[in-house]
Amino acid sequence: MQTTVEPIRGTNDPVQSLELSLVVPIFNEEQSVGPLVERVAAAMVSYPHRWELILVDDGSTDATLVNARKYVGREGLALRIVELQRNFGQTAAMQAGIDTARGRLIATMDGDLQNDPKDIPSMVSELERRELDLLVGWRKNRKDGLFLRKIPSWCANYLIGRITGVKLHDYGCSLKIYRASIIKQVKLMGEMHRFIPAWVAGVVPSSRIGEMAVTHHAREHGVSKYGISRTFRVILDLLSVMFFMRYKARPGHFFGSLGLGLGALAMLILLYLGFDKFILGNDIGTRPMLMVGVVLLLSSVQMITTGILAEMIARTYYRDDASPNYIVRQIFDDQSQA
């Protein structure tokens, strides 16, 4: 059974008074999900507004979903579980949770107990005090390995800041607070969740994006889903971010500029060879430079053609961009348990 998540409409719906939705993607966290719910519930006792917890089960193959469902319908806990059809990845799971969220503010965090939900109320207060649209957690005293996690993270944060212009200490921290009206304008894709501040900067001024030091714990159960191979994927994603940040609405400019540059170089070479052939009378048929000029000219035509096709695809994407990058199998909440 596939379920389509519909946006909440109408001002008379009681869920409109929800202040905060906490979205937590989970994958094979059977030992962590119970303590996670308990800690979130305890941390939010002092929060004075209505809130909900949304767990997104990203195709777990262990007892994660079974253990999470035990808390549905618990008194004083507004819990919704979004079960995805299969494993779509953390970015898609986060997007599913954001699409499902009904609060005015949306918080996200990991489900491995390394983020501390006690930081959420103070982060909400800080977001409002500084009038921000996005507040990013900064794991100042990070409890991870130095060589496999910390050093690659430092390098990635530096590169992302340089490329995007949004300088933060910790892009990779999942603990973030957004205004729902802003984050719902951003469509996440691929494995771009770590670059969310950069995408948000395309919607609001970077001055409305801030950070705050948060608590970070060592992992208690299971093993990290991240390894050294993830670092190489981050580099590839970073190249994609650089392209989309600069050319997402006009990709033809990128390919066109490259094509024109190659074409100009090809014309210089061919004009020189033409002068050498027809004015000076030299034989150019066996000269390698002739082949270089022809290859550059053909590459120029190919780049310009690619730019035109990219423009057509981009226009089609922005016109028809409605399909989600995930499939929901079922949603469990108070109503489904009744």
From Swiss-Prot:
Keyword Signal: no
Topology relative to the membrane: Multi-pass membrane protein
Gene assigned in the entry: rgtE
Protein name, UniProt field: Dodecaprenyl-phosphate galacturonate synthase
Biological-process GO terms, alphabetical: lipid glycosylation; lipopolysaccharide biosynthetic process
Disulfide pattern: none
Keyword terms: Cell membrane, Glycosyltransferase, Lipopolysaccharide biosynthesis, Membrane, Transferase, Transmembrane, Transmembrane helix
This protein's record includes keyword Transmembrane helix: yes
Annotated function: Glycosyltransferase that catalyzes the synthesis of dodecaprenyl-phosphate galacturonate (Dod-P-GalA), likely from UDP-GalA and dodecaprenyl-phosphate. Dod-P-GalA is the lipid donor required for GalA transfer to lipopolysaccharide (LPS) specific residues catalyzed by the GalA transferases RgtA, RgtB, RgtC and RgtD.
Chain segments annotated as transmembrane: 254-274, 289-309
Cellular location(s): Cell membrane
Family from the record: Belongs to the glycosyltransferase 2 family.
Domain of life: Bacteria
Catalytic activity: di-trans,nona-cis-dodecaprenyl phosphate + UDP-alpha-D-galacturonate = beta-D-galacturonosyl di-trans,nona-cis-dodecaprenyl phosphate + UDP
Uppermost EC category: transferase
Summary of the knockout phenotype: Lack of Dod-P-GalA in total lipid extracts. The membranes of the rgtE mutant are unable to provide the substrate for heterologously expressed RgtA activity. Cells lacking this gene produce an LPS that is devoid of GalA. They are also more susceptible to deoxycholic acid and to the polycationic antimicrobial peptide PmxB when compared with the parent strain. Pea plants inoculated with rgtE-deficient mutant show discoloration and wilting of the early leaves.
Gene Ontology MF annotations: glycosyltransferase activity
Protein EC: 2.4.1.-
GO CC annotation: plasma membrane
SUPFAM superfamilies (UniProt xref): Nucleotide-diphospho-sugar transferases
